[in-house]
Structure formats: C-alpha cells, structure tokens
Swiss-Prot record:
Active-site residues, as the UniProt record annotates them: 146
Similarity comment: Belongs to the sirtuin family. Class I subfamily.
Protein name (database record): NAD-dependent protein deacetylase hst2-1
Location in the cell: Cytoplasm; Nucleus
Keywords, ordered alphabetically: Coiled coil, Cytoplasm, Metal-binding, NAD, Nucleus, Repressor, Transcription, Transcription regulation, Transferase, Zinc
Co-factor remark: Binds 1 zinc ion per subunit.
Annotated Zn(2+) binding sites: 154, 157, 178, 181
A Gene Ontology biological process term: rDNA heterochromatin formation
Amino acid sequence: MGNESSTLVDEKTPPSVLEARTVEAVAKYVKEKPVRRVVVMVGAGISTAAGIPDFRSPDTGIYANLVHLDLPDPEAVFDISFFRQNPKPFYALARELAPGQYRPTLAHSFVKLLYDKGKLLKHFTQNIDCLERLAGVPGDMIIEAHGSFATQRCIECKTAYPDDLMKEAIAKGEVPNCAECQGLVKPDIVFFGEALPSAFFDNRTLPETADLCIVMGTSLSVQPFASLPSFVADGVPRVLINRERVGGLGSRPDDVLILDDCDNGVRKLARALGWEDELERLWEEANPNQKSREEELATPRTREERLENEISRLTAEIDKTLKISDAYQKRVRERLEGEPLSSPESNGTGLAHVFPHLARR
C-alpha cells in the first residue's frame, strides 16, 4: 500500500462490489450492505464555500499581501524559529484564520450526518479551521493531520492554555504568554520545523478497516496525507468528490468520481440516499450566527468585497504591528539562509503541508 496506479480504470472493467460506478450505486451499497465504517478524508476544498479567504490569489490573497510586508519571507510567519523571535506577525494573521467567523459548509454537515447515522469511523482533515467541530462532529472522531486552533499550549513547557484567554488574545491581536513559565503560547497547528501530531500516525492505517472511503476537496499532493486512500482495501468503494480527479482515485474498479464542488457533490449523494432534507436541516442548525439562508442571500456585500475589506484590515494591522528593523531583518535572513525553510515541492513539508489554503498554484 502507499503506491498505486494513476491510470483511470478501463470503462469496460466492471465494478467488483458496486452495481455501477455511479452515485446511485454508491447509495444502494450504503443502504444494503449496510455500511458502518466510513472513513472521510478532506482538504481545503471542503471549506471554500464557507467564505474562507482564498489565500493563494496572486493579486488579492492574504499571501500576496504578506509578500509586501517587512518580513524576511512571507512563509516565516509560519516558521517555528521565526515565531520564537517574533510572534506578532502570526497573531496579527491569526484573527483571519481562527474559528468563529465562518460557518460550516454543506460538506461539513454531511460528515456530521454520517456520524449521526452511526456510519462514521474516522474523519481525516488537512484543515486547521475547526469547521467539522462547529458542524457538530465530536473531536474524538476527527484526525487533524496539520493540527488546529481547537487547543493551544506553551511552546516551552507544553502547559495547556485556557480557551477563553486564547480567544481574547487572538481577538485583540495580542501575544499570549504561559502563566507557568512566561513562554510563548501557540495554537496546536503544525508550523515549519514541527512534527505532525502523533494521532495522525497512530491512525494512519485505519482506512484498512473501512467499508467505504469518501475523499473531498483535496489535491492529494502532499505526503503523508496523500497516501491515506491507498490504505483502503481492494474491493472497498472509494468516492472522490472534487472538481478534478486526483491521486490514484479512479484507478480501481469500485472507485466513483463525482467531479463537482464539494457541496454539490454531497448534495447529490445525500439525494440518492434519501438524506437531503436531513442534510439541509443539519446545515441550517450549524450556522453559529443563526442567519437564515434568505438573510444570507440578502447580504449586500459580495464575497469579493468582504475579502477585500478583510485583507485591507489585515494588511494595515500587520503593517502597524510589525516593525522589524533593517538590522533585525538581516539577522533573520541570515538565519533562514543557514536553516532554509522546507519546500512544498521538494519534500512535502512546506506551506501547503501545513496550510492547504496557502499553497502556491
């Protein structure tokens, strides 16, 4: 396992378990088997409809704005060594990334529906936005491969830091310090120079026991997350819900490709299962701001306008907060040249590995 063909299965090759490689056949399989051990694997695409800024945009994204600030390198904001030297840039940015201002998507609610029906074995995510938790999926059902904002601790003595104090610090753009040793506090998200959570490796082979695998909104280009679908046993259906085919999905007789955005894809599957009304109700209940769909549609500002305002405020805040002297910049650049940041293209441990939204196109 871990290596499989990327060649699309011949259309003439019949499925071994499903009646056909269709959404309807998957729904029939789920209901008749019956399926009880679904493993879900997701990436940044599952959160697109939540309105989270597209950090990758070359002209308007947050990443593009960081490029023009007085940083030795935009990626330094997410480097643990740089964070130790100057945590202010990260906390200026954290307000845009922290949970609470974005609502779960229909795809997140679909995962919750799987859990409610007793069918979810485990949910693997590359995202740090905690939207699965906001949708109601219990934390013990989630493997956050790149960590998340759900918890935080001191980077020195590892003492946990209270949630309420962390939320207050992020809201104010302040840097929190440990009450025990005065060390810097950081959310439990994976920075450059840090290992992935042990929970990921402890559960990495869990897909071997699945009776259905659903992959959504990920390019499957970053290891070790990208290898997860290959652990699914032959003969177990794998469903890809994504705008394009990725990884080795589609190479097995029982792989089903739903090439669409994640929300449309889960709606199609829910409709075939007879779950559409339940899914819509769960999604409505998952709105932390308790706005109706009509109210959301009536909101006068477009997503682009909201994003532009958010980026302008963020850039101004970081520009005001971050005042790195020329001498300090020189020292940091020299340190980074001596200890180069990992490259996403070279070994999969770079920015895309930690923050999928920030990956360069």
